[in-house]
């Protein structure tokens, strides 16, 4: 759980910015969005396969570009 202690001389904006940074660092929002709706295991598997294929295609493109130079 993220907690932010605000000093007397510290402004609200600065404390809010620090809070947002801590949340981003701990990936709380990303995890919440991922779990917001139920996804079937088959859907998750299909998404992972598509992501893998995209990564492989990107690697191939970069390699071809590197060799072409």
UniProtKB/Swiss-Prot annotation:
PROSITE patterns in alphabetical order: RIBOSOMAL_S21 (PS01181)
Top-level taxon of the source organism: Bacteria
Alphabetical GO biological process terms: translation
Example GO molecular function: structural constituent of ribosome
DNA repair listed as a keyword: no
Keywords: Ribonucleoprotein, Ribosomal protein
GO cellular component assignments: ribonucleoprotein complex; ribosome
KW Isomerase (keyword) present: no
Family: Belongs to the bacterial ribosomal protein bS21 family.
HAMAP family: Ribosomal_bS21 (MF_00358)
PANTHER family in UniProt: MITOCHONDRIAL 28S RIBOSOMAL PROTEIN S21 (PTHR21109), SMALL RIBOSOMAL SUBUNIT PROTEIN BS21 (PTHR21109:SF22)
Protein name (database record): Small ribosomal subunit protein bS21
Organism in which the protein naturally occurs: Borrelia hermsii (strain HS1 / DAH)
């Amino acid at each position: 759980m993220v907690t932010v202690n605000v000093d007397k001389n510290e402004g609200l904006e600065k404390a809010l910015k620090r809070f947002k940074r801590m949340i981003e660092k701990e990936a709380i929002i990303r995890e919440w969005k991922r779990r917001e709706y139920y996804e079937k295991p088959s859907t998750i598997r299909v998404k992972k396969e598509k992501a893998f294929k995209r990564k492989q295609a990107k690697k191939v493109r970069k390699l071809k570009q590197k060799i072409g130079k």
